[in-house]
Each structure stands twice: as structure tokens, then as C-alpha cells.
């Protein structure tokens, strides 16, 4: 609904969205309401924008265990389930969970049935969000205006997780687990600006000055209970104090900034922009909380200075340099205390938080440059845009792992400079343009190379996450690739041949943290095409990525479970390499024979199973193309 008059207008809308997920028992539902309005009175213009939404999500754990429970998600369960066993058979007649291996394995070593996860384990969340802003603008003169804007972004997310008793979890959760987490976020901002714009002959000048204030607050309340006294009754009062965990936290951050921008152009042909901003952050030390970052950019439409050329319609060169500052998260300067998880004589105390504070933190600084050219040919039927850029970050704030002797696990520090450089090329045009038909086509190609330098002394590898599959991790190596993969490789001799152990199986190298791959592609891009016939348009987009490595975690998990194509041959396996005597040999293990393994007679079936697991451990490289 919309309406208005000469001096006012408004817009009111509502929407409802409901989608069932591809995975059974999952879905997403969202309702949204929005209002925009504006009223002019003399030299003043008042504006308001308000939006409210509520979203509900039914989810499922797809891949990883929850809270280190040793369980798995639906997709992991699918990958690992035996193809000869009916996956839909997840309940016994008495309602207990069907176990593929019966009582032959501990419950934590069993396979998690995907249908059990979908029907018994419930993950839900509800999010209510309110955003709004109010603005007032005063047009003091045709070349001078002042505006003030105040805004809010507030939302609350409540999520719950229910794990039914008897699943593939750690033993403490065999009688079930239930958790609730409430996260509240509130962001308040104000912005005061004034703008001057004047034309002097062929020159146009624009000056903008302003100040802003940002206030961010969060509240978190978390509750968890497990090992319930009454079966299938998931409530916090149904668990003893030893089987409950409650916690809460809150944070506040404030950022104040002043900024300015000067723009000038001559005959809409030569352009210059200079800007600067200074921020004061509450999350940095007093001596470092003020940081300034400027930028400058310019461009020239050089075809305006050339005689008319039929085949060249437009040409522009551009260049820019910018610096951007960044603060850190709240409470990174001091070491926090939190309640100890251990009790002594019925009493508890406080201990240091696992992340050590650092009162000497500096802001992160990122500097970027760009040189580019834009060309259009044959009356704009063919277009080309090329750019070369650098993007370097200094004094990155990170939290590397510390020695256990320090009493902490992590510490916030300034360490590591990241250097990126790359190119982007876009070629587009209109190959066909008739009265009824139009075909527009654009291809974009880009490539980036990132390296990391100046890591903290003693930090040989920078891990961006603690998550790993097998022995593979996302990592950055000093003076090496920023988006590398770390892992281990086979131990090899001087000729590059795999070294076998006394049992005839491959051995790992002594270094388990080698750079075994680079996640960064050689180049990537897209090809977009739009075909139009008498107002009817069809759009097609192809994305491509060439080069780079990924770790095939899916195949790794399936091989360990014995259900991958790699592990299909269970009757015989051949392993080639150099034995302990330095001789190149090929060892063959057959399922129907007995071998000596670690000094004991062992079935060939066991040897083959161990070999498949052993061989699957090192990272395997996969090139995306």
C-alpha cells in the first residue's frame, strides 16, 4: 500500500514466506511488516523507516557432532550408513533405537541413523527483529543542507536443542540432553552531517562533514541439562545440579567517529575525491583507541580530450588509495574471571578465562590500492573493464594458541600482516540487437594471491579455525599462502618413494603440519547472458572456479566407515613402497590368508580394514575446475 501528496508520501507492506526444507522435518517461516514515510514542511524534511519481522526455523544437525558429544548429523549418517541395511528402520518394536551392530560396539562407536536424528533430535530457533530510523533534513540553501539520523537494529534469537535418550552421544547424554540459548542484540546509531555543493564555472565542488556514534550491546543467557531422571521429560527441573549448566554474559561497545569528504570534478571529465575519518573505540587501550584513516581517488575520461574516433565510444582511467582502521571485540584488554567448574568441599571459586587479555592492542589497518581502465567500443556494443589491486592488512588482531604453561589457551595479539594482490577483468557487450531481439553477454574473471608475513614469534603456522577433518586444517604459513591447507604426507626416501613400516604399510612423515594445498583458486569468474524478445527476458549465469585445492572430507568419512568406492575391494589390497631394507616392494594382502601384524598372526580381512583406514588418513588433493 502506498500513497502521498505533494509534500508527503508513505509505503506500507507485509509479506509471509513459508518453505519446507529439502531434508524432512525442516523448514523456514518468516513474516515481515514494513513502513516508510516522509513529510516535508518548509525547509525541513522528516523521514521514518520501520520494519518488524519474525522468523521460525526447524533445523537438523547436518554434519558435525554437537557440543563434542561424539554424535553426527544427518548427512554424516547417510554417508556412513551401510547400503545393505534399511536406513528407515531406526526403531525397534519397543521404541528403542535400532543399532546396526547390536551390542557389538559401544554406543558412542555406533552409526547414527539419519531418520533417528530427524525424528528424535529437534533443533529450533525463533528470531524477532525490529529495525527503524528517524531522520530530519534541513535545506538551508540550494547549496547547503544539514541532516540528522537516528537508528536502531534490535533482535532476539531463542534457540533450543533436544537430543533424545539412547542416541549416539557421549555416555553422559545417554538419558537425553536439552538446551536453550537466548541471544539479544541491540545496535543504536546516530549520524549528523552537513553538505555543501557549489558550481564555479566548469568546476563542481562538494564538501561533506559529519560525526557518528555507534553503541552495540549484547546479552546471552544459556541453559543446559542432561541425564534426566524421568525418561523423555526434557526440563531443567528433571535433572540434578550436577547435570545442569547455566551461564549468562553481556557486552557493550561504543564507537565515535568524525569524517569528511571533498569531491571535485571539471566538466564532468576529471574527478577527484579525498576523504578522511577518525574513530575512537571503547575496545582499545586509551593510548591506541584513536585512529585515523584517509583515502584518495581520481579518474579521467580521456576520450573527452581526443578527436572523435568511430570505434572508441568511451575511455576512462582511474586510481585510488585507501586506508581503513578496525578495532577489536569488547573486553580483549583484560583477562576475565569466570566461575570454576570444579567444587571443593561444596564451595566454588573463580578462575581465569581461557583467553588472556592484552592491554597493548593496536587497531588493525588495511591499505588498498587500485588502478583501472574502462573502455567502450562501437557505440557501446562492446565493453571492457580491467583493474589491478593490492589489499594489505597490518597488525591483525588474532588469538593464537599458547603453551599450556601460561595458564591460558589463547591470547589476543597484534601479529601477522596479510598481503593480497590480484586482477579483475570484465568483458561484455551486445552481440545481437534488433527490433525484437537483444542478447547481452558479460564474462568476469578474477584472480587473487594472498600471503602472510610477520607472524608472532614462536607461531610457525596461523590456524584460522580449530576445525579439522582427518589431519587437514585451514592454515596460513609465514611467507607462504594465506589460504593454505596444513596436514601430513607419506614419509618418502630421496627418490620420492613411499617408505613402508615393518608391517608393509605406508608411514607418515615426521612433520604433521606441512603445507599440502592452497584453497585459493588460480582464477574464478562468471558468464552472464540475458536474451530479450519483445519484453520477455531469459537470464543465464554460469560460475566457474579453476585451480585450488579442497580436502574431500566426505570421502574420508565414508572410507573410515567402509562404504566408499575406495574401500570397495575388501578381498585384496596392494601397497607399494620402500621397505625397511631400502628395497622397493609391493605387498599384497588377501582376505582369506593370515599374516603377521605387529608380531601377531592376524586375519587378512583385518589387515585390509586397517590398511584402508591407514591409507585414508593423509590429505588427498582435489582440483576444482
Predicted features and spans:
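A generic beta-sheet turn/junction motif
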Residues: 3-7, 16, 39-43, 198-202, ...
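Glycine-rich, aromatic-lined ligand/substrate-binding cores of catalytic
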Residues: 519-551
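Short glycine/threonine-rich loop-to-helix capping motif typified by GTGT followed
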Residues: 286-290
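Surface-exposed loop/interface segments of Gram-negative outer-membrane beta-barrel transport/assembly proteins
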Residues: 22-23, 32-129, 149-256, 283-285, ...
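A short, flexible beta-alpha/helix-coil linker loop
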Residues: 16-20, 277-282
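Residues on the lipid-exposed face of transmembrane beta-strands in outer-membrane beta-barrel proteins
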Residues: 1-3, 33-39, 132-138, 192-196, ...
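Extended, hydrophobic alpha-helical segments in both membrane/secreted and soluble proteins
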Residues: 33, 190, 258-262, 270-280, ...
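Outer-membrane beta-barrel translocator/receptor signature
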Residues: 1-33, 41-44, 130
